[in-house]
Amino acid sequence: MKLQLNQNFARIKPSYLFSDVAKRVRAYAEAHPDKKILRLGIGDVTLPLTPTVIRAMHGATDEMANAATFRGYAPEYGYDFLREAVARHYASFGVSLDPGDVFISDGAKSDLGNFVDLFADVPVLVPDPVYPVYVDSNLMAGRTIEYVEGNGENGFLPLPTGLSDLPRLIYICSPNNPTGAVYSAAGLAEWVDFALRTGSLILYDSAYEAFIADGSPRSIYAVPGAEMCAVEFCSLSKTAGFTGTRCGWTVVPAALGSVKPMWERRQATKFNGVPYVVQRAAEAALSDEGMKECMEHIAYYKENASLIAGLLSKKGIAFTGGTSSPYLWLKCPGGMGSWEFFDKLLSEAQVVGTPGEGFGRAGEGYFRLTAFGSREATREAVERLDKLL
């Protein structure tokens, strides 16, 4: 082939963080087939879809089997019934949305990477440590990335203090992946004020909003003025166990002017919509009964987090998260590096976590554990770590 490839791909790591983790775990498992490995690494759920969701999927599947109720291509922006259900969900925690501003997606990850299609070569600001998709999708597009560091001193919740007034795309995730830290209303207000003053746009990832239990905002739109400077991305992956079912949404307020019609045009060209069966399942998950069941699952994962947090506290290991988040972000003991600690846990306890270095330079020396395992696996992992650490 004589065509020139996108040279920006040379700016990203050859493989994705979780692929690297999986490769090391696979190699260890092949070399030690007698060892039982407990996985507290990648944030995939383990509980099944809830009864309300399954009933809706069965009903929608039956509709697809009947010529009178069969549906083909879904609307690019989502069926009205689900857009309205999302708006009702936001209303349940005091945020008013126009259903017409809601765009149904196959999960937050895709739209977080694709939304930057709307922008020219503009500067991008990301927190560090950071979910790798924010960085890689912009490096692929050739953009310049600026980092604002999260650390123990600021509780891994960096603020715009000291930043220049350059307009930027600004990524914020709360509750944060990987650190589990949650912005207060005052903290988010500082970012909204900064974005309004500088003409920036916040790309707000609220994928873990259902885990919030301390009264912190569950949406950027709980902050006055955010509709003028923010797009919000959310997902049912962790709220309703949809990691393998795939459904979420992106909120693009009409107040953002040309951004919304541009996103409509982009989606009409590059997206064929989320399947009808999945959207009916999502509608059911967001119903009163569906959310009750979802919150029972979230309580299960939070109990797992409590078990892990109890161990870390017992060992005197500093950490964030685990209360309003499924993630626990801990300081590697003994001054160990992230991958060094990963190898120690895998080889000596057969417990898998995620090295903080994979989330950015500021993540070196830290480690992420997740609460998405089964109760039995979490208890066993805690027992093993109790003996090791």
Where are these regions (language model features)?
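N-terminal small-domain helix-loop-helix segment of the aminotransferase-like
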Residues: 2-106, 114, 285-288, 389
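Helix C-cap/helix->beta junction micro-motif
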Residues: 32, 141, 197-198, 315, ...
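Conserved core of the PLP fold type I
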Residues: 68-194, 209-223, 227, 231
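PLP-dependent enzyme catalytic core of the Aspartate aminotransferase-like
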Residues: 88, 96, 335, 344-353, ...
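Hydrophobic residues in well-ordered beta-strands that form the structural core
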Residues: 126, 147, 204, 353-355
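Conserved core segment of the aminotransferase class I/II
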Residues: 225-299, 306, 310, 389
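Conserved glycine-rich beta-strand-loop-beta hairpin in the small C-terminal domain of fold type I
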Residues: 283, 298-309, 319-332, 363
